[in-house]
């Protein structure tokens, strides 16, 4: 049997949250040999959002070191040597298959045993696959999902070998929109397919979505709405050649990319800690129902102080900030001190083609569109506010400057009162910049 290893702190998972937790442990003075990161991936933590942006653009020839944590915030990049110098043990290519939280023991797929005093669950999410729904042919070659570096490498290789071929993107959310743009930029003929009446329906209003759909159409991307992929045709090599749609149509395809959502990976901890809304229930310090187990990033369901409700957030900004909060809380508790509870302002952003948008707050209540949302404008700039109980609770802005984006963030946190939707529509962005 493999030798048992013991650490004061163990982070399970090797994504963004894990990397930023390691960074904060170092900032808090962790001693060499106290901390280990155990990750299924073969590389140190990196900025996962880059996979659907810079990394997948073949002309850029971007390489991984550019995306190591903490490149996303302009911090020092954490190369493998960074962890070694800090005395942080990186245990890569290692999947934990069993967690006994009562015994504070983890077991890997090869039988290696790890003991800890404090555990941080940073296991992230897994992609939802079409095979999960029993879609015929969903395991064909050249059907891709994007979650990890290896996925991006396989996709990039296919994009190069199938240059000027036909690509079908299944899904109209974040991944669908970003990869649709990336595929087009890499000279593929792109069709997007999604069942909803417009793209990004969890965030976008119909007015916001109409701009992006128009912009993508002007770039030559074909959009098929209101139907789903119901099957795939393959050639003698098992490679996908067609996507069959539920409405009876078929689409030629050399490459298919699927982005239909993710699921938090919490099976290791099942029936050992409290769960809520699909994640591990935590307090405002990311401590679970077990005092020495913390959950950060995608897997944490935490108190959203601003809205007085429990939420789970899948986003890089929260992954970074929850990691920092948890580590600060752990170290403060050890010293008999306390820190303020997590007070998170929801934040989402995306970049595709020459576009760049940011959103802050909550997209609930009535919405008001302002600005120039004509897809054919040379420099489109528009936004939206969400109003609930006569207060502005959310704000979206496309094409904003850093100062303007900061203004909508401040607005979303301040939640100012508003006289009427008409006034807000007329004032537009100036309502935020004058707060």
Swiss-Prot record:
Cofactor(s) of this protein: FAD
Binding site for NAD(+): 172-178, 196, 202, 261, 314-315, 349
GO BP field: response to zinc ion
Binding site for NADP(+): 174-178, 202, 261, 314-315, 349
Subcellular location as annotated: Cytoplasm
Cellular component, GO annotation: chloroplast stroma; cytosol; plasma membrane
Enzyme Commission number: 1.6.5.4
InterPro entries xrefs: FAD-oxidoreductase/Apoptosis, FAD/NAD-bd_sf, FAD/NAD-binding_dom, FAD/NAD-linked_Rdtase_dimer_sf, MDHAR3-like_C
Annotated coiled-coil segments of the chain: none
UniProt: L-ascorbate binding residues: 320, 351
Factors inducing expression: Down-regulated by atrazine.
Keyword tags: Cytoplasm, FAD, Flavoprotein, NAD, NADP, Oxidoreductase, Phosphoprotein, Redox-active center
Any one GO MF annotation of this record: monodehydroascorbate reductase (NADH) activity
List of residues binding FAD: 14-17, 41, 48, 53, 96, 147-148, 298, 316, 349
Modified residues (Phosphoserine): 417
Catalytic activity: 2 monodehydro-L-ascorbate radical + NADH + H(+) = 2 L-ascorbate + NAD(+)
One Pfam family in the UniProt entry: MDHAR3-like_C
Its job: Catalyzes the conversion of monodehydroascorbate to ascorbate, oxidizing NADH in the process.
Family: Belongs to the FAD-dependent oxidoreductase family.
Protein's recorded name: Monodehydroascorbate reductase 2
Organism annotation: Arabidopsis thaliana (Mouse-ear cress)
